[in-house]
């Protein structure tokens, strides 16, 4: 059985700005096919010390979820900026609201939001649990917010200090 505690990091210096731009570019065909656009607002040279492959998996998962649950013809928004020695990454999509009581549960293994959100995708409900584990192994946090207009996933990671 899959065990989240088996995740081992192989960290190094990582340009998060470049990674996020690259993931957005890689998903261009999927976005175009669904008549979506991706608005990217990323500060230049956001550097962290982290596992590139594992973090790419986190952001790829968040973007694919945003695409799956986005209203047709709308935009997915990716923002990343440094504040107070932390980097905040927001992946947002316009679409159906996640009920307040389900926002924290979506990070549990095998959890799926009921109703029309879950009928659009066929995942096993592991993606966000894995994302949370990877982010926490990087001494970061991940949370979700949802209102009538959009759903936002906010990842906060420690920024790399000068000389690290």
Spans of features found by a protein language model:
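Conserved micro-motifs of the catalytic ATP-binding
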Residues: 4-9, 47-50
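Conserved catalytic submotifs in the C-terminal HATPase_c
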Residues: 10-13, 32, 37-46
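Short helix-loop "hinge" at the ATP-lid/N-box region of the Bergerat-fold HATPase_c
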Residues: 66-67
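Short conserved segment of the HATPase_c
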Residues: 98-112
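Short alpha-helical Gxxx[C/S/T] motif in the catalytic ATP-binding
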Residues: 122, 127, 131
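Conserved glycine-rich
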Residues: 139-140
């Amino acid at each position: 059985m899959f065990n989240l505690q088996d995740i081992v990091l192989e960290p190094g210096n990582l340009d998060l700005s470049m990674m996020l731009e690259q993931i957005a570019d890689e998903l261009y065909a999927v976005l175009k096919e669904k008549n979506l656009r991706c608005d990217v607002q990323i500060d230049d040279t956001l550097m962290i010390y982290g596992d590139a492959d594992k973090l790419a998996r986190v952001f790829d998962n968040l973007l694919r979820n945003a695409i799956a649950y986005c209203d047709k013809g709308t935009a997915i928004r990716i923002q990343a900026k440094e504040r107070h020695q932390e980097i905040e990454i927001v992946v947002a999509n316009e679409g159906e609201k996640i009920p307040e009581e389900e926002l924290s549960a979506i990070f549990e293994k095998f959890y799926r939001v009921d109703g029309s959100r879950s009928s659009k995708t066929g995942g096993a409900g592991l993606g966000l649990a894995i994302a949370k584990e990877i982010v926490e192994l990087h001494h970061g946090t991940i949370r979700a917010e949802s209102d009538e207009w959009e759903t936002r996933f906010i990842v906060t990671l420690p920024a790399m200090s000068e000389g690290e």
